[in-house]
A protein has these predicted regions:
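Absolute protein N-terminus
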Residues: 1, 20-21
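Secondary-structure junction/capping motif
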Residues: 3, 35, 95, 114-119
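Sec/Tat signal peptide C-region and signal peptidase I cleavage site
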Residues: 14-20
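N-terminal secretory/targeting leader peptides
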Residues: 21-110, 125-318
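Hinge/lid segment of periplasmic solute-binding proteins
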Residues: 115-129
């Protein structure tokens, strides 16, 4: 009788033991391994793996050589990979709301306090089968980088490389736009296929674009966003302890975003040293340029997402 009770107790223990086993999550990046985004992530992953032994581990599969950048979002949605290091601009084909992340005028830490993060996570759950773990790039404006100067904020006659981030704004300024993956931009500049591109204040040296860039238009606009997103089904399959551990690690990673302020200052000085000249307008024109960027983008977002667009604007704006 005692043997039967022992076997029953052991059988009851098996599911709990199986659930407590260490889980490894597969991660893929839309950005190359030499970018600051992936270098920062590598530090995060090493810390998580050291503290998560026996509980949770991350396995970095690779960047664009492993998967095309614009396919990462769908790979996360469908569970081909567990976590994506990517930007919403690269998976707007899944849901238009992904492009609204560039319009945040509040830091990620404040969005966690005012309900903005919860709104994003709810939308990502519903429309993309994703969990929005953390934003790992912040305080980083976008700019237009050019191979030739402009005297005013009019891009008529220019061919500019874009992602969905800049499409509507650059078109509103008269540009002809060409969408490519980051890895194709250098060749496009070299061959004269494009006259410039949109990119954050940082990162152009990671791709050697500075070699073909002559000007940066001021002021910057929007706020560069790179985030960690996870497949919702995979998230639900973790134990409560594993979800809590991953969430705490992600929030701690996000809390380091202040470091982008100094990094961006250093990158600006580095661009100047490389001979990239800033094109500045008078104060009134600069304000109009900046405001128009947001007006155009929010108009497009609310048209594409009449339910969530206004809610996001309310929580994202100062």
């Amino acid at each position: 009788m005692r043997s039967i009770r022992s076997l029953a107790a052991f059988a009851a223990f098996l599911p709990a033991a199986a659930m407590a086993q260490e889980v490894t999550l597969r991660v893929v990046s839309s950005f190359a391994e030499n970018t600051q985004y992936v270098r920062n992530f590598d530090g995060f992953m090493k810390k998580l793996n050291a503290e998560g032994k026996g509980n949770l581990q991350l396995n970095f599969i690779g960047g664009p050589k492993a998967m095309p950048p614009f396919e990462v979002g769908n790979a996360v949605r469908t569970g081909v990979v567990d976590i994506g290091l990517t930007t919403g601009a690269f998976y707007t084909n899944i849901m238009p709301e992904a492009d609204a992340l560039k319009l945040t005028q509040l830091p990620a830490t404040e969005l966690r306090r005012n309900g903005g993060h919860d709104l994003v996570n709810r939308i990502w759950n519903e429309k993309a089968n994703m969990v929005y773990l953390a934003r790992i790039v912040d305080y980083s404006p976008f700019h237009a980088y050019l191979t030739k100067p402009v005297a005013k904020p009019d891009f008529t006659g220019l061919k500019l490389r874009i992602t969905p981030v800049y499409r509507e704004f650059f078109q509103a300024l008269g540009a002809t736009v060409v969408q490519t993956a980051p890895g194709e931009v250098y060749t496009a500049l070299e061959r004269g296929v494009v006259d410039g591109y949109g990119w954050p204040i940082h990162g152009i040296f990671d791709f050697n674009w500075h070699e073909k860039t002559r000007h940066r238009v001021e002021p910057g606009f929007y706020n560069a966003e790179v985030s960690l997103v996870m497949n919702l089904d995979r998230w639900k399959g973790l134990t409560a302890a594993q979800r809590d551990f991953l969430s705490r690690q992600a929030v701690a990673f996000e809390a380091q975003n202040n470091s982008w302020k100094k990094y961006n200052e250093d990158e600006t000085r580095r661009q100047q040293a490389a001979g990239i000249q800033a094109i500045s307008f008078d104060a009134a024109t600069a304000r109009q340029f900046h405001d128009r960027a947001y007006e155009v983008a929010w108009a497009g977002m609310i048209k594409a997402s009449p339910v969530y667009g206004p809610q996001m604007r309310k929580l994202f704006s100062r």
